[in-house]
Amino acid sequence: MAANYSSTSTRREHVKVKTGSQPGFLERLSETWGGMFVGLMAFLLSFYLIFTNEGRALKTATSLAEGLSLVVSPDSIHSVAPENEGRLVHIIGALRTSKLLSDPNYGVHLPAVKLRRHVEMYQWVETEESREYTEDEQVKKETRYSYNTEWRSEIINSKNFDREIGHKNPSAMAVESFTATAPFVQIGRFFLSSGLIDKVDNFKSLSLSKLEDPHVDIIRRGDFFYHSENPKYPEVGDLRVSFSYAGLSGDDPDLGPAHVVTVIARQRGDQLVPFSTKSGDTLLLLHHGDFSAEEVFHRELRSNSMKTWGLRAAGWMAMFMGLNLMTRILYTLVDWFPVFRDLVNIGLKAFAFCVATSLTLLTVAAGWLFYRPLWALLIAGLALVPIIVARTRVPAKKLE
């Protein structure tokens, strides 16, 4: 298979050096204007991210509180209770599918909700390391290109390499990755909707120790099938295939007991479908394991809180970086004076930190204003603290 491509060898590398003149003041000023535009976009985007995140977080929290107050647990999962029609139900049980999932090309068959085939190709990979330095009043950029062979699941286009000769990769894989999904999945008498099936994602590696080599040109080593003449010494273009599964259906002597999940959804006949809340959100929850309704909602609230704080931090960082780029022009104007330049740089970063913090808190308060006005006013008050502290320090310095 690999005869038409570059043969595998030891790590290779080469170095390129580009020389250019030091950028003048106008050139650096022009680059700063481009950075200011990028900074402005990041600054504006941060407001949208922070504001919409607060609305999403409060909407989710309200929906979860509503769901917790309405959820009911049926007496049995093996019968459909008519009195629960349209209600939010809490179901615990083992997953069950109607048929085996299989990949006949490799002799893999098992009862599960999902079966994933993962294909990797042995390919050349280019890594690039650059450094800039000044020599004889010229700016030089040294770039070191290194080439090594690795197993990769995506095609690496060797035409984009700095030096393709001797490092050519195939343009396609003879075998592709895929995921097979059971069309019907049940818990007792209840059928899971497609949204719940998508949430079954606890993939586990499938051991191939009890499987035979499916074809004479495929060799099994460990938990991989190799399309290779010698798996110990692979060539560029060789393939290796592994399998994983999610949601084991029924007890299996080799794979273990059936996978148990906890589902909270709306009962519609014998189906479990999304539940619409008064706030306009939907509840369709699946957790791996056996949990009470209270535990599920507590886990969801904790997840919502972590996501909210993560997006707040991302919004603050976007605002901070945007302000840094927007004020960079002031640094460029004084970068001829080393001492003054360093002081200005520290001052600009402190300014960006204070403004980003204040504006983030104000934006959070604006997002909360639609749901909890009192909390919004409190946060707005806290947002003014850095500004008040900064203003009180100025008169103190004047008195000195």
Curated annotation (Swiss-Prot):
Organism: Pongo abelii
Gene: TMEM43
Residue numbers on the Perinuclear space membrane side: 53-313, 367-368
GO biological process annotation, one example: innate immune response
N-acetylalanine found at: A2
Principal subcellular localization: endoplasmic reticulum
Family, as annotated: Belongs to the TMEM43 family.
Subcellular location: Endoplasmic reticulum membrane; Nucleus inner membrane; Cell membrane
Protein name: Transmembrane protein 43
GO molecular function: identical protein binding
Topological relation to the membrane, as annotated: Multi-pass membrane protein
One Pfam family of this chain: TMEM43
Keywords: Acetylation, Cell membrane, Endoplasmic reticulum, Immunity, Innate immunity, Membrane, Nucleus, Transmembrane, Transmembrane helix
